[in-house]
Regions:
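Bacterial N-terminal signal peptides that target proteins for export
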Residues: 1-7
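C-terminal motif of bacterial Sec signal peptides marking the signal peptidase cleavage site
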Residues: 14-17
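Sequence context surrounding c-type heme c attachment/ligation sites in exported
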Residues: 19-56, 64-149
Length: 149
């Protein structure tokens, strides 16, 4: 019985591994970056909404990390949509490059403004709410136009 279970588990794991995105492909690279951005953003939002304790130094570091991450995924969107693999990006990403790039720049500006807000002392979570909301709004704007749900 154990052998059957082990064989079944091995087969399932092998099949699951076959369907993944190549982590070195442009799609794999941007998915990794977007997941990191989401995790950092959720932590920042959690601190401001009371879901997580507000830790000033962690917030400052995470805001800087988010700003850094925000500048990296765009290079992994090739000019022409790559073949193969499932992507949540709509075809509009490649058909409306100027608009996509404009939203990317808005996102970068919003994270830069959040970092700037972390330099004001004493650091108060209430003073960070509006800059963080702009970051979240810029994410949402791009998702609404260019992400297939």
């Amino acid at each position: 019985m154990k052998l059957k279970s082990l064989l079944l588990l091995t087969t399932v794991l092998m099949l699951a591994a076959c369907g993944g995105v190549d982590p070195n492909s442009p799609q794999g690279q941007r998915q990794t970056i977007f997941k990191q951005m989401l995790k950092v953003s959720e932590n920042l939002g959690g601190m401001l909404r009371g879901r997580l304790p507000f830790k000033e130094q962690v917030f400052v570091e995470d805001a800087a990390r988010l700003d850094q991450l925000t500048r990296t995924p765009w290079q992994h969107f090739p000019q022409v949509k790559e073949e193969g693999g499932e992507t949540r990006a709509k075809d509009d990403v490649w058909q409306r490059q100027a608009r996509f790039q404009a939203l990317a720049r808005e996102m970068e500006a919003s994270t830069a403004a959040l970092v700037a807000a972390t330099t004001v002392r004493p650091l108060q979570s209430a003073d960070l709410a509006a800059p963080m909301q702009r970051v979240e709004d810029s994410c949402k704007a791009c998702h609404e136009e260019f992400r297939a749900f």
